[in-house]
Swiss-Prot record:
It comes from the Bacteria. The gene is rplC. It comes from Rhodococcus opacus (strain B4). Belongs to the universal ribosomal protein uL3 family. This is Large ribosomal subunit protein uL3. Gene3D superfamilies: 3.30.160.810, Translation factors. The keyword Ligase does not apply. One of the primary rRNA binding proteins, it binds directly near the 3'-end of the 23S rRNA, where it nucleates assembly of the 50S subunit. GO terms for molecular function: rRNA binding; structural constituent of ribosome. Part of the 50S ribosomal subunit. Forms a cluster with proteins L14 and L19.
Length: 218
């Protein structure tokens, strides 16, 4: 469900640090370089069947952009950008093609949802990937310390059920962390200081938008 209050911006995760609040307490924050984003297209109910704004972010060599995508940027009157996403909104009247969005779309104390790609861990076992306890370290255990154990009976069920937690590739998943507080907006430097941790590595792309479950707090 869309909401007229929903705002959003693309940015880059710079890393974590700590700051002090007005009560002199330490607050762990993640620093996000937010924008600048540019509006490249506006979707409307009449023409597209839904309301949304298309945001573009990040520099890219124009020679690396194919012709159809280059044409879309040319139509919007902006230079090509590396990342393009759509933000669903109920009211597009606040946006216009070519408009630039910065960190100032949010205010101090706003609640946001942050989406990013988690760090890739490669092939991982069940203890790391799913938190399995493993087996005994002694008392007769031999070369089974980190094994998962049984994955199904021989005759019944005679197969491995779908969804069985096993070893495999871990990380590099799209993850959204909800209801994080914007501790401070540094408009001069285009930074968002978000309380707590957010998904992804340093330098990774993140999408910051108004909290879906934030209610009046957002």
């Amino acid at each position: 469900m869309t909401d007229t209050k929903i705002k959003g911006i693309l940015g880059t995760k710079l890393g974590m640090t700590q700051v002090f609040d007005e009560n002199n307490r330490v607050v762990p924050v993640t620093v996000v370089k937010a924008g600048p984003n540019v509006v490249t297209q506006i979707r409307t109910e009449e023409r597209d069947g839904y309301s949304a704004v298309q945001l573009a972010f990040g520099a890219i060599d124009p020679r690396k952009v194919n012709k159809p995508t280059s044409g879309q940027f040319a139509k919007a009157g902006v230079t090509p950008r590396r990342h393009v996403v759509e933000l669903r909104v109920a009211d597009t009247s606040e946006y216009e093609v070519g408009q630039e969005l910065t960190a100032e779309v949010f205010e101090d104390g706003a609640y946001v949802d942050v989406t990013g790609t988690s760090k890739g861990k490669g092939f991982a076992g069940t203890m790391k990937r799913h938190g399995f306890a493993g087996q005994g370290a002694s008392h007769g255990a031999q070369a089974v310390h980190r094994r998962p154990g049984s994955i199904g009976g021989c005759a019944t069920p005679g197969r491995v059920f779908k969804g069985m937690r096993m070893s495999g590739r871990m990380g590099s998943d799209r993850i959204t962390t909800q209801n994080l507080s914007v501790h401070k907006v540094d408009a001069e430097n285009g930074l968002l200081l978000i309380k707590g941790a957010i998904p992804g590595r340093k330098g990774g792309l993140v999408i910051v938008k108004s909290a879906v479950k934030g209610g009046a707090r957002a």
